[in-house]
Design a protein with these regions (language model features):
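Divalent metal-cofactor coordination and adjacent catalytic microenvironments
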Residues: 100-108, 135, 299-334, 343, ...
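Structured, contiguous alpha/beta core segments that scaffold functional sites
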Residues: 1-257, 261-263, 267-270, 274, ...
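Short proline/glycine- and acidic-rich turn/helix-capping motifs at secondary-structure junctions
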Residues: 242-246, 332-337
Length: 384
């Protein structure tokens, strides 16, 4: 019987379990692959290009502060410096680039709130942290404390953006971990279990005991069995009364997900959420064409980038602004037209009375017509 057939038989058995699928040999199988970090994952050029593309776009969208009045969003002056400069000498563009890169690599972006407004207690200065120095002290799926370097902080003193979330866990996941989690059934059916679950000898995430307790001889075997059980499946290893979540390093099994899946460059683009053609990869379909660059960008915005932008707007609005004010990222900047297309659109908007000439001129940083310009336009109209 082939390995695939045997895996399928065990999976469909009444009392099927992962242990019976792997067998005793897998229980003690060791991985010779090295532990890699999220930085080394960026060596993959397609992964790097996709991450940078997403971060570049999100960080350069113009930021507007608006107030909801009836059915309209009315622009209002920013209530403070935080929207334009979240930390001294750190612009909004730089801040958003860093947080987007961290979210795509770790699933989380963390900063320490160093200063708050006197009125409303909203953040005025947030110092982003290197994720390799960040830990989350947790009680079940709830964050009770953050550790940044050697210092501990209450959750209210932390700016925490996240993506790829799952129910019951207050932390986000990186795209590969999220994909690996949700592809479990497919992985087993394709004989993935024997390579994925048995091949990783290190935990995906380390949970460190923060108590000074020592393990005595009577508990050594129990601790050894627990460690072997967790690391065998690439799962989280829990030890001690209190523990800390550390996201900076992942096991070879997690970081090698693309290689184990024999993923193509197109698959990498699917994991990161970027159309293949935008990072120089052949899409492989051969039949998807766009009339212009704008249509391609629109598809990317709607299908890939838009949802994360909406979540970012919601978080910033909830954490940094009083109600009913909220943050809007002007995603129209992604849909910049070529000169001819822009001119045609302006003519149509004016003819359909959707925009006035003054509003359209503002898009080119031009003021309203002055008296001489109006007279000149009248002369041209008279000449036909």
């Amino acid at each position: 019987m082939s390995r695939l057939a045997e895996a399928w038989r065990v999976l469909t058995a009444r009392d099927a379990s992962l242990n019976s699928l792997l067998g005793d040999r897998a229980r003690y199988r060791q991985s010779s692959a090295p532990v890699v970090t999220q930085e080394s994952a960026l060596r993959n050029s397609v992964w790097w290009a996709g991450s940078v593309l997403r971060a570049n776009l999100v960080s350069t969208f113009p930021v507007d502060v608006v107030r909801r009045v009836g059915a309209l969003d009315v622009p209002v002056p920013s209530p403070g410096q935080f929207i334009a400069e979240p930390f001294p000498d750190v612009s909004s563009n730089e801040f958003r680039f860093s947080t987007q890169m961290d979210k795509d690599r770790y699933g989380n972006a963390v900063g320490i709130i160093r200063e708050r407004t006197v009125k409303g207690d909203y953040p005025m200065a947030v110092e982003l942290q290197n994720m390799s120095t960040v830990s989350a002290v947790m009680d079940g799926g709830k964050i009770v404390q953050w550790r940044c370097g050697r210092d501990y902080y209450a959750p209210r003193d932390i700016w925490h953006e996240k993506q790829y979330t799952i129910s019951g866990l207050a932390l986000g996941l990186n795209p590969l971990t999220y994909a690996a989690r949700d592809l479990g059934i497919y992985e087993s059916a394709s004989d993935w279990a024997l390579d994925w679950f048995a091949g990783g000898a290190l935990p995906r995430v380390t949970l460190k005991n923060t108590q000074p307790d020592k393990i005595g001889p009577e508990n050594a075997q129990e601790a050894r069995d627990k460690f072997r059980e967790s690391t065998r499946g690439g799962d989280i290893f829990v030890h001690g009364v209190e523990w800390e979540w550390t996201p900076a390093t992942t096991s070879a099994a997690t970081s090698g997900f693309l290689e184990q899946q024999e993923s193509s460059e197109q698959a990498i683009c699917r994991f990161i959420g970027v159309p293949a053609m935008m990072v120089g990869v052949d899409g492989g379909t051969g039949n998807i064409t766009y009339a212009n660059v704008t249509q391609a960008n629109l598809q990317f915005l709607i299908m890939n980038l838009g949802p994360s932008v909406i979540r970012l707007e919601e978080y910033w609005s909830r954490k940094a602004l009083p109600k009913p004010w909220h943050v809007k990222l002007n995603t129209d900047a992604l849909l910049r037209l070529d000169p001819q297309g822009k001119a045609d659109l302006m003519v149509k908007l004016n003819a359909m009375k959707v925009r006035t000439p003054t509003e359209l001129r503002q898009l080119d940083n031009l003021g309203p017509y002055d008296a001489d310009q109006i007279a000149e336009i009248g002369t041209f109209a008279a000449l036909g």
